[in-house]
């Protein structure tokens, strides 16, 4: 990501504010948010920015195709990015109308006219096969109750040759994070087991996609991968079958 785009995104973040607790935590930008990032995730602001930049690296800076973001959450992570993508056709979906409402407000504040918002379930996406050039998922898969359905639906709506990129929590990378997830976040209903490990996620993605790039920053895995132009018809079924045998 070049400096011009970074400056544009940073400027947009100032417009959206992000001064509530959730936005401050997810961006590690407020005093309370930085405290949570350090305590729960063992991360500082630079590390939070690093995994997000890697997760977004699958989106070309001149992107003008169709992009699906699921879940969009409050939009604090992506509305500023979308401000730099005026030619893109963007669809944002979230199961929570409250979260999505906050994203819509941010889009309105930034005068974004190329975004459509839908309330819905990632396990049953209301889109035709091969609709999107890119599917982006930031910090969502660890919360999805039916992760197999989510993987299947993302694969289905992505065009052959399209990019799937994003990030989410993986277990086994940071002990303190694992403890908080198990004892606090699960009980609060924010996270839903089972969780991927970094190696398990890489294996899963490599069975479904090609050109898989994956890394971790503490307990967060980021990834970028591409759906084959002519994918094997049984690639998804094979991946699911092997996962069930484990």
Q: What is the predicted role of each segment?
A:
Residues 16, 25, 35-41, 165-223:
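C-terminal alpha-helical "lid/dimerization" subdomain adjacent to the S-adenosyl-L-methionine
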Residues 134-146:
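A short SAM/SAH-binding and catalytic strip from SAM-dependent methyltransferases
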Residues 123-134:
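A short acidic, Gly/Pro-enriched loop at the edge of an enzyme's catalytic core
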Residues 148-160:
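A short glycine-rich, Lys/Arg-flanked "PGG" loop and its adjoining helix->strand segment in the class I
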Residues 66, 161-163:
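Short glycine-centered segments of the SAM/dcSAM-binding site in methyltransferase folds
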Residues 2-61, 80, 182:
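Conserved class I S-adenosyl-L-methionine
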Residues 207-246:
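Core SAM-dependent methyltransferase catalytic element
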Residues 66-124:
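Class I SAM-dependent methyltransferase SAM/SAH-binding core
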């Amino acid at each position: 990501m070049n400096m011009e785009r970074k400056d544009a995104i940073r400027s947009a973040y100032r417009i959206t504010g992000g001064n509530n607790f959730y936005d401050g935590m997810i961006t590690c930008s407020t005093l309370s948010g930085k405290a949570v990032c350090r305590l729960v995730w063992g991360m500082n602001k630079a590390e939070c920015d690093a995994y997000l930049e890697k997760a977004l690296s699958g989106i070309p800076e001149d992107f003008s195709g169709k992009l699906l973001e699921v879940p969009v959450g409050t939009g604090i992570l992506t509305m500023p990015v979308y401000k730099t993508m005026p030619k893109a056709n963007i669809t944002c979906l979230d199961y929570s109308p409250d979260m999505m409402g906050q994203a819509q407000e941010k889009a309105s504040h930034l005068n974004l006219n190329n975004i459509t918002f839908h309330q819905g379930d990632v396990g049953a996406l209301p889109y035709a096969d091969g609709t999107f050039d890119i599917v982006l998922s930031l910090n969502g898969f660890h919360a999805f109750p039916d992760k197999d359905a989510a993987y299947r639906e993302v694969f289905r709506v992505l065009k052959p040759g399209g990019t799937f990129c994003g990030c989410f929590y993986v277990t086994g990378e940071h002990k303190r994070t694992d403890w908080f997830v198990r004892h606090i976040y699960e009980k609060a209903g924010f996270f839903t087991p089972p969780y991927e490990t970094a190696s398990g996620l890489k294996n899963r993605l490599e069975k479904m996609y090609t050109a898989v790039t994956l890394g971790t920053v503490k307990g967060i895995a980021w990834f970028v991968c591409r759906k084959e132009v002519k994918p094997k018809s049984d690639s998804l079924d094979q991946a699911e079958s092997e996962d069930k045998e484990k």
